[in-house]
Regions:
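Acetyl-CoA-dependent GNAT
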Residues: 423-485
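A nucleotide-sugar donor-handling region in carbohydrate enzymes
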Residues: 128-181, 186-218
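C-terminal alpha-helical cap of glycosyltransferases
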Residues: 365-390
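Conserved N-terminal entry element of GNAT/NAT acetyltransferase domains
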Residues: 381-401, 560-562
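Donor-nucleotide binding loops and adjacent catalytic segments primarily
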Residues: 201-277
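Conserved GNAT acetyl-CoA-binding A-motif
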Residues: 505-527
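A short, well-ordered alpha-helix in the C-terminal region of glycosyltransferases
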Residues: 345, 352-366
Length: 562
């Protein structure tokens, strides 16, 4: 698969569009694909990041005000990519139509566009446009309605946040409690503690703070952040990423305080630097999601309008300390005494920092780029998820009378070959399992029938929250068995659809009492079981977890995406 990534960065645009495009590039290259990154890139930091990436770089002019796509059209004609992914707020809304047009003019002319998958990155309403695949990594995006625009593949929510491999590596080195326990043990050995090092007996104060307002801090938030730190009255070692006039303002903000300040230009491995500090103050752009993924206590501000929604959601989720009050604008960090109090508490209470780490790691799990790239592969194989009409199938709850038939279906050799456990199940073991299943609140066991008789069984199991993984108590994993005598009749999708409908109906409205309302359907499939893989790929299930050592891969279908 050949992938063309279109993005711009540097100067007033910041670096976020390019950084997350590079995360996708790394994942695509790791999957064995060829990648070209095209765009207008300014500044030594971005140039260094691009030079170090395992991709070809095509330098273009920035998007023209009149939406001139000709440079991109020429590049598509020359490279003939399988996937064109665009991460830009400035591209024309009709990008997909213009790029894939076969009517001549600015389009591809005589080239066949039918195999080109157009993918688009959006942040809520910013950069929104129709495409074959739309990625909105905004935390909580899947909870809000999105206007229908004909996009067949929607990847919405923070599970699709692309982060670079160095961030994933930093996450793997960390644990949920490392931010407090490990660092606190290190600090106890320090000989230069001050009077505030054990405030109110809650534990030791954080020593080191990093201030990084994106790759370039285009609106100059760093001085206000340093001023807030100075007003806490704590003795802190502060590293601030700032250049030029902004760096001078940062130094001025620290004068007369207990801060020991070090001002640096943007660094190549920001993930390593973030991991080395007790707390980071960040803008609510790309960096905040990297911090969540790694597990670093964070205080956050919003720098530009497209960051405000993410800022509000990450603060509400308890994954970051908010420094912008509802009455404050994006540039006004220095004037809110409540922000100083919140910041001081986070710096002096290790349990506050530990809670931030735990909440953040559940928002971003580091697999977003893999999920996007795997969906591109799926979109090429399945141009769009087929519409599933009403099927003459009814799923009903299993009854004791169904026990023997389900046992026989389970022990069928073909069924066992595709199961996690391929051993035969004894009648006594099955009967105990079946009887218990009928009364469990975390399992829904269904028998699916049509006018011809029993067609199979669908079982749903509630997936409990896993350490370090997003999701949990509202996700249900499916297991499908087609009646052996009904194989070869293309019943997989009707069975699955009937099972989804029955589960949604059974759990609807029970959130208050049981907390089991469906948020997502899950499927775990052996990667060598091509029929099952195809079933879920053509039923709008998206790749969610890579194959485990046993060769089982997880798919996910969000019940809330609109």
């Amino acid at each position: 698969m050949r992938v063309l990534l279109r993005c711009d960065g540097g100067g007033p645009l910041g670096v976020g569009h390019v950084i997350r495009s590079l995360a996708l590039a790394e994942a695509a290259v790791d999957a064995g694909h060829e990648v070209v990154v095209a765009g207008h890139f300014e500044g030594s930091f971005l140039q260094g990041q691009l030079a170090a990436a395992p991709v070809e770089v095509a330098q273009l002019s920035a998007w023209a005000a009149d939406g001139d796509l000709q440079p991109l059209i020429d590049l598509v004609r020359r490279l003939r990519p399988d996937v064109l992914h665009v991460d830009s707020y400035l591209a024309p809304d009709r990008l997909r139509v213009l790029v894939t047009s076969t009517g001549g003019g600015a389009g591809l002319g005589d080239e066949d566009p039918t195999s080109l998958v157009v993918s688009n990155m959006e942040d809520g309403t910013f950069g929104r446009r129709p495409a074959d695949v739309v990625v909105d990594p905004t935390f909580g995006a899947e909870l809000s309605a999105r206007p229908a625009d004909g996009t067949p593949w929607l990847l919405r929510g923070s599970r699709y946040t692309p982060v670079r491999q160095r961030v994933i590596d930093a996450r793997r080195r960390a644990s949920d409690d490392r931010a407090s326990d490990h660092r606190a043990s290190d600090h106890r050995a320090s000989d230069d503690r001050g009077p505030d090092d054990n405030v109110g007996g809650v534990g030791q104060v954080a020593r080191s703070v990093l201030v990084v307002m994106g790759g370039t801090d285009p609106v100059g938030l760093a001085p206000g952040a340093v001023e807030l730190l100075a007003r806490t009255g704590l003795a802190l070692e502060v590293t601030a990423i700032a250049v030029g006039e902004n760096a001078e303002r940062v130094r001025a903000a620290a004068q007369g305080s207990r801060l020991s300040l070090n001002v640096l230009a943007p660094v190549d491995d920001l993930a390593a630097m973030m991991s080395a500090h007790d707390l980071v103050i960040s803008a609510a752009g790309t960096s905040i999601w990297e911090l969540c993924c790694i597990g670093v206590p964070t205080a956050v501000a919003w720098a530009v309008d497209n960051q405000r929604e993410g800022y509000e959601r990450v603060v509400a989720a308890g994954a970051a300390i908010g420094l912008c009050g509802p009455e404050l604008g994006r540039y006004e960090l220095g004037g809110d005494e409540r922000a100083v109090d919140r910041l001081k508490r986070a710096l002096t209470d290790p349990e506050v920092r530990a809670r931030l780490v735990r909440a953040g790691r559940q928002i971003v799990d580091g697999l977003g780029a893999w999920r996007v790239v795997r969906t591109w592969e799926q979109a090429l194989a399945v141009p769009s998820p087929p519409e599933i009409g009403f099927d003459p199938m009814v799923a009903r709850p299993a009854t004791p009378e169904d026990s023997r038939q389900l046992w026989q279906w389970r022990n069928d050799p073909v069924t066992r070959a595709g199961s996690r456990s391929s051993a035969e199940v004894s009648w006594d073991d099955h009967l105990r399992w079946f009887t218990a299943s009928l009364t469990r609140t975390d399992r829904v066991l269904l028998v699916v029938e049509d006018p011809a008789g029993p067609a199979g069984t669908v079982r749903w199991d509630l997936v409990r929250e896993r350490d370090g993984e997003p999701g949990g108590s509202h996700e249900w994993e499916v297991s499908i068995t087609v009646a052996p005598e009904r194989r070869g009749q293309n019943l997989g999708r009707p069975l699955l659809r009937a099972g989804e409908v029955a589960l949604a109906e059974k759990t609807s409205g029970v959130t208050r009492s049981g907390g089991t309302e469906v948020h997502a359907y899950l499927a775990v499939v052996r990667i060598d079981n091509q029929s099952s893989m195809r079933l879920f790929e053509t039923s709008a299930y998206l790749p969610d977890l890579p194959p485990d050592p046993g060769g089982f891969m997880r798919f996910r279908k969000d019940a809330r995406v609109t």
